[in-house]
Structure formats: structure tokens, C-alpha cells
A protein has these predicted regions:
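Conserved class I S-adenosyl-L-methionine
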Residues: 96-108, 127-130
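Conserved SAM-binding loop of SAM-dependent methyltransferases across substrates and taxa
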Residues: 107-122
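Extended basic-aromatic, gly/pro-enriched interface segments that bind polyanionic ligands
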Residues: 127-209, 213, 221, 246-247
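A short glycine-rich, Lys/Arg-flanked "PGG" loop and its adjoining helix->strand segment in the class I
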Residues: 223-235
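Conserved beta-strand signature within the Rossmann-like core of class I S-adenosyl-L-methionine
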Residues: 235-243
């Protein structure tokens, strides 16, 4: 069992060594991530993990994926994408440049979902899409756009709920063991490493998706990240959070509810 003191000491050592601040992440989630990491590498003590994390940069870069479990899939929560298609994106039908940020994009399934929706609305070629994540390994997979073929049947169910007559072959090139996102989608996404907790964001966006990311944060860290997202949104822009995310009271002072069911919030025009 990992004690609070051991966890705090390890997180502080990581912060001092790599500049990554996990001190306000949800403690139970971090402890479970550490247990997964130790089991995966057959480590018997936290001291053994501590030494490896602080001495081996490549090991730590890969360990981030075990510390932070990514929740993502193609067309996850179809009603969100239907709301985007039938309401939110209609407001940008005549704009020349639509800017969208996927904050915490994980392995890219949600990014490519948005690209498919944008194409359907005739907006893909007028949209600048930025997708960021803390994990370099997740970003590499997202850039490649390669997913195990067996996942396609799983992803087909929510896709059909969104668009009943869709075929995966319209969006992916299939090979024996995997499917690859068609280049017309990959070419319109810029993937970058970004830490929501410590890194600034100088660009401005009409839509930001930060879904199932804040579940790992305590209230203090949620407020800090929401400040960043608020500043990055243009007035009248939309923030979309995940079904497992809970908007804290502080966030409710920044954003107004657009659609509670789909967790869509709006930055007031006068902000």
C-alpha cells in the first residue's frame, strides 16, 4: 500500500526532475497508476520505481501512459457529435478560419472523429485543428492514425448511431491487422506535446475539447486548467468536457451552460 507521504514525495521528486506537476492530481488515480507501473515492470518496492523514474528519462516518458489512463474511442458519446453537427458547427458555416483545440487528445480517436464531422459539414478545409497531450507515446500513435483492426467493429456501433449509413471504409484504409485514418484527415491536424498544468497556450480557439481529462485533477488543479481554457477561448466560444468530468463551482462562474447533457459550455460574449 502506498502511503500519502510516499506518494507526495515521489510526485515532488518528479516535479523537481522533469518539471511535471502531478501534486494536485487525484490521489487514488495516481496510486492505481503507480501500482500498474510497478506490476508491469515486476518491481517489488516504491524505492525501485523511484530510482528508475528519476534516472531514466525514456522510462519515465513511457511511464506517463500508465500513470494517466486515457479514455477515448472513435465517436464516443454519439450525442455529443450530433449536437456539434446539428447546432454548434452551424454557427461557423461562413467563417474562413475555424480554430479547434483538442486538449488532452490521447491516441487521437476523438481528433479524427471531429475531422470526420467537419468534413461532413464542409468545414474541414477551413479549420485549423491543434491536438495536444502530455504523453509523447500517445501523440506518436495519434500522428500515425493506426488502430487495431479488431477495434473497428467496436467503433462501428457509436458511428452508426451518429450516421446510420456510414462505413468505416469511408474514413480508414484497412490492412490485415490494422486500419489507418485516411490522409485527408491526418493532413489537417497538428499534434504537439503540451502540459495543461504548466504550459501556456498563446493561440485562440472557437472550440476546445477537453474530455475526460479533469477527472484526474483535484479542485485546485481543475480551477487552474479551466483558467487556461477560458483564456484560450474566444468570446462566445465553446468548451466541451467529458461525461465523467464534473464542472466545479469555479468553472460555473467562467462559463455558461450551452447543453448540460452533452457537457457543452460557452464563454460569454462579453468576457
Amino acid at each position: 500500500m502506498i502511503s500519502e507521504e510516499e506518494l507526495s514525495a515521489l510526485m515532488m521528486a518528479i516535479k523537481n526532475r522533469y518539471g511535471l506537476d502531478f501534486t494536485n492530481y487525484e490521489k487514488g488515480s495516481l496510486k492505481r497508476g503507480i501500482v500498474r507501473l510497478m506490476s508491469k515492470h515486476h518491481m517489488e518496492s516504491l524505492i525501485e520505481l523511484w530510482g528508475r523514474v528519476l534516472k531514466d528519462h525514456d522510462f519515465f516518458a513511457n511511464a506517463i501512459d500508465d500513470l494517466l489512463v486515457n479514455l477515448t474511442e472513435l465517436f464516443r458519446n454519439p450525442d455529443v457529435w450530433i449536437k456539434l453537427r446539428d447546432d454548434i458547427l452551424l454557427q461557423y458555416g461562413t467563417v474562413n478560419n475555424l480554430n479547434i483545440w483538442h486538449a488532452g487528445c490521447s491516441t487521437g480517436e476523438e481528433v479524427y472523429t471531429m475531422a470526420i464531422v467537419l468534413e461532413e459539414k464542409g468545414l474541414l478545409y477551413r479549420t485549423n485543428v491543434l491536438a495536444t497531450d502530455l504523453s509523447s507515446r500517445a501523440l506518436a500513435k495519434a500522428r500515425g492514425g493506426n488502430y487495431p483492426r479488431q477495434l473497428m467493429n467496436q467503433y462501428l456501433t457509436p458511428l452508426i448511431k451518429y450516421f446510420p449509413f456510414s462505413r468505416m471504409e469511408d474514413y480508414f484504409d484497412f490492412e490485415k491487422s490494422h486500419a489507418t485514418v485516411k490522409s485527408r484527415y491526418k493532413d489537417h491536424v497538428r499534434f504537439e506535446r503540451h502540459n495543461l498544468v504548466t504550459d501556456p497556450m498563446h493561440e485562440r480557439f472557437e472550440i476546445i475539447l477537453c474530455r475526460n481529462v479533469m477527472i484526474y485533477f483535484d479542485e485546485k488543479l481543475k480551477s487552474k486548467v479551466l483558467d487556461l481554457l477560458f483564456q484560450a477561448l474566444r468570446p462566445g466560444g465553446y468548451l466541451i468536457i467529458g461525461y465523467y468530468d464534473i464542472m466545479p463551482d469555479y468553472g460555473k462562474t467562467l462559463f455558461k451552460v450551452k447543453d448540460l447533457q452533452t457537457r457543452i459550455y460557452q464563454k460569454p460574449l462579453d468576457s
